[in-house]
């Protein structure tokens, strides 16, 4: 049975344990988050005036990499076909001064730069920059600008430390300071590594003897971080729905072949 347990949730990240799965599923979830969860990003720019020191192409690339808020409640982001919807982000600026992402004017108030303080270009006295940028829904598999964030996972492991190891109390104290669960018996302590835990060098000689590491079968610790386009919990939810939809489509195609 698949189980999820949230370890830590912040406005821009979430850490959780998923149990009862294998490596292919864990990697499929990671790849789906990175390559299949759609977001808005600038896909085309029409320059009307550019007196800045940067070529049009450089500014267009910078605009494309600005994370744009994506209203998940308005679009079927878990659908296999994306909505054909375009948002216009306009700018008319004159130097001197720095042009920031927050200066962009959006035709849709729900689709705008997630961070208004991203610098785009610095204009000198008398320089002007005017353009219309067009943002569309896309997927990370087509371009990194559509990736909703970052995701990585590790095996859930347990470190068994025998009380015969000199200064084992030091490891217990270190693990507790890191916020790691520690179980203690008469013979040993067991540290569950829900996040990175590195042994001090003085204990390395005891690895494989008084200290051993155990991989918990079928359990993985995931960390997902959002760029700001989507709430981090929605990224995971949408990715799981996409996985289910693709699996259903695959099964249906198999049934057609069987018939």
From Swiss-Prot:
Q: Which reaction does it catalyse?
A: RNA(n) + a ribonucleoside 5'-triphosphate = RNA(n+1) + diphosphate
Subcellular location, in the record's words? Cytoplasm
Give, as one word, the top-level EC class.
transferase
Spell out the Gene3D superfamilies in the cross-references: 3.30.70.3110, DNA-directed RNA polymerase, insert domain (2.170.120.12), RNA polymerase, RBP11-like subunit (3.30.1360.10)
The name under which this protein is listed is: DNA-directed RNA polymerase subunit Rpo3
Show the CDD domains listed in the entry. Answer: RNAP_D
HAMAP family according to UniProt: RNApol_arch_Rpo3 (MF_00320)
Enumerate the InterPro entries for this protein.
DNA-dir_RNA_pol_30-40kDasu_CS, DNA-dir_RNA_pol_insert, DNA-dir_RNA_pol_RpoA/D/Rpb3, RBP11-like, RNAP_Rpo3/Rpb3/RPAC1, RNApol_insert_sf, Rpo3/RPB3_RNA_Pol_subunit
GO cellular component terms attached to this protein's record: cytoplasm; DNA-directed RNA polymerase complex
Q: Which UniProt keywords apply?
A: Cytoplasm, DNA-directed RNA polymerase, Nucleotidyltransferase, Transcription, Transferase
Please describe what this protein does: DNA-dependent RNA polymerase (RNAP) catalyzes the transcription of DNA into RNA using the four ribonucleoside triphosphates as substrates.
Checking SMART domains in the record gives: RPOLD (SM00662)
Organism this protein belongs to:
Thermococcus kodakarensis (strain ATCC BAA-918 / JCM 12380 / KOD1)
**Which stretches are transmembrane?**
none
Q: Which family does it belong to?
A: Belongs to the archaeal Rpo3/eukaryotic RPB3 RNA polymerase subunit family.
């Amino acid at each position: 049975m698949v189980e999820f347990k949230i370890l830590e949730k912040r406005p821009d990240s979430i850490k959780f344990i998923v149990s009862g799965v294998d490596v292919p599923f864990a990697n499929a979830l990671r790849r789906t988050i990175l390559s299949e969860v759609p977001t808005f990003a600038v896909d085309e720019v029409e320059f009307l005036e550019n007196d800045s020191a940067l070529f049009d192409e450089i500014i267009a690339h910078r605009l494309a990499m600005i994370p744009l808020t994506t209203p998940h409640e308005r679009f079927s982001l878990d659908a296999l076909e994306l909505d054909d919807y375009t948002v216009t982000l306009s700018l008319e600026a004159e130097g001197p001064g720095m042009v920031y992402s927050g200066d962009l004017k959006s035709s849709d108030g729900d689709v705008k730069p997630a961070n208004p303080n991203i610098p785009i270009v610095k204009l000198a006295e008398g320089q002007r920059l005017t353009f219309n940028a067009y943002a569309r829904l896309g997927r990370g598999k087509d371009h990194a600008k559509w990736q909703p964030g970052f995701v990585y996972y590790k095996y859930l492991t347990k470190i068994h430390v025998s009380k015969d190891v000199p200064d084992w109390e030091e490891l217990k104290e270190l693990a507790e300071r890191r916020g790691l669960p520690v179980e203690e018996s008469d013979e040993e302590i067991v540290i569950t590594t829900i996040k990175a835990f590195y042994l001090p060098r003085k204990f390395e000689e005891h690895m494989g003897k008084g200290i051993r590491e155990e991989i918990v079968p079928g359990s993985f610790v995931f960390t997902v971080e959002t760029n700001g386009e989507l709430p981090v919990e929605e990224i995971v939810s949408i990715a799981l729905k996409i996985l289910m939809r693709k699996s259903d489509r695959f099964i249906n195609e198999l049934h057609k072949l069987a018939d």
